[in-house]
Curated annotation (Swiss-Prot):
HAMAP family: RNA_methyltr_E. Residues 203-276 are annotated as: Disordered. It catalyses: uridine(2552) in 23S rRNA + S-adenosyl-L-methionine = 2'-O-methyluridine(2552) in 23S rRNA + S-adenosyl-L-homocysteine + H(+). SUPFAM superfamilies: S-adenosyl-L-methionine-dependent methyltransferases (SSF53335). Keywords: Cytoplasm, Methyltransferase, rRNA processing, S-adenosyl-L-methionine, Transferase. InterPro entries: RNA_methyltr_RlmE, RNA_MeTrfase_FtsJ_dom, rRNA-MeTfrase_E, SAM-dependent_MTases_sf. GO terms for cellular component: cytoplasm. Gene3D superfamilies: Vaccinia Virus protein VP39. It holds the Pfam family FtsJ. This is Ribosomal RNA large subunit methyltransferase E. The lineage of its organism: Bacteria, Pseudomonadati, Myxococcota, Myxococcia, Myxococcales.
Length: 276
């Protein structure tokens, strides 16, 4: 039988003792240790970052030569590390990706999400809302991850979970389902991990870098340049030449008019053929 909910259990007290903002720090720490997802100097994006439990661990993993970006609907208190950048971002807004790219223009090697819905106690509803958040996070990951990158997200286990797993398997080389030790016994949350984002699934990772923008612009330039080329090809000069070639024929047609009656008959026959 599961233990009753205790908001101040072992991991809560341990987090407070170690200066961590949330018990979730132990969850991502375990996942990183087991799967080696980050190195110094890399870039990581944390969705639903407040209060900063994940972000504290992720920032230490990438170090001062890397970059850790955290976004949430609520403000994230500063960590005091210059390579950590945070912002208030609504992932449902059309400009969400642009906001993220102002914090880091390049692709990320890891995207994490500890987002959870406001539960109402109805399991099927809570599960459905959790899946919506994971899919929203996955959409952001596909548009910001570099090929070969990884994705970690919290989700509530339920009847539709196998469908989500198949969606991840279609995009990543490896998919793992992890239940860290710091998850409460009474909780049915797990973390899904996708490793090795396939190049075909990385829909907008190249555009996450600002560099390709001028490339696409310059590509369109030759297209406009080709317009004069096609114009010069279809220049009416040859048509005018044909018209000028036909002009001298008019006197030649008039010449038989001074000839015999038979010549006039031939001219009339030719005229009737042209009329047809």
């Amino acid at each position: 039988m599961a233990k009753p909910y205790d908001p101040k259990d072992f991991y809560y007290r341990k987090a407070k003792k170690e200066g961590l903002r949330a018990r979730s720090a132990f969850k991502i720490d375990e996942i990183l240790r087991r799967h080696r997802l980050l190195r110094k100097g890399q870039a990581v994006l944390d969705l639903g970052a407040a209060p900063g439990g994940f972000l504290q661990i992720l920032a230490d993993e990438v170090g001062e030569t890397g970059v850790a970006v955290g976004v949430d609907l609520e403000p994230v208190r500063r960590l005091g590390k210059p390579w950590v950048k945070t912002a208030i971002v609504d992932l449902l807004s059309p400009g969400a990706l642009d906001q993220i790219r102002t914090l880091h223009a390049g692709p990320f090697q890891l995207v994490t999400s500890d987002m959870a819905p406001k539960t109402i106690g109805v399991k099927i509803t809570d599960e459905a809302r959790s899946l919506e958040l994971v899919r929203m996070a996955l959409d952001v990951a596909e548009k910001t991850l570099a090929p070969g990158g990884a994705f970690v997200a919290k989700v509530f286990m339920g009847g539709e979970f196998p469908v989500l797993k198949k969606e991840l398997q279609a995009r990543f080389d490896e998919v793992h389902v992890i239940r860290p030790e710091a998850v409460r016994e009474s909780s049915y949350e797990v973390y899904v991990l996708g490793k090795g984002l396939r190049r075909a699934a990385a829909r907008a990772a190249p555009t996450a870098n600002a560099t390709p923008t001028p490339t696409s612009t310059s590509t369109s330039t030759p297209t406009s340049t080709s317009t004069p080329t096609s114009t010069s090809t279809s220049t009416p000069a040859p048509t005018l030449t044909q018209t000028q070639t036909q002009t001298p024929k008019k006197p030649a047609r008039r010449a038989p008019a001074k000839a015999s009656t038979a010549g006039k008959a031939k001219a009339k026959t030719g005229a009737s053929r042209r009329t047809r």
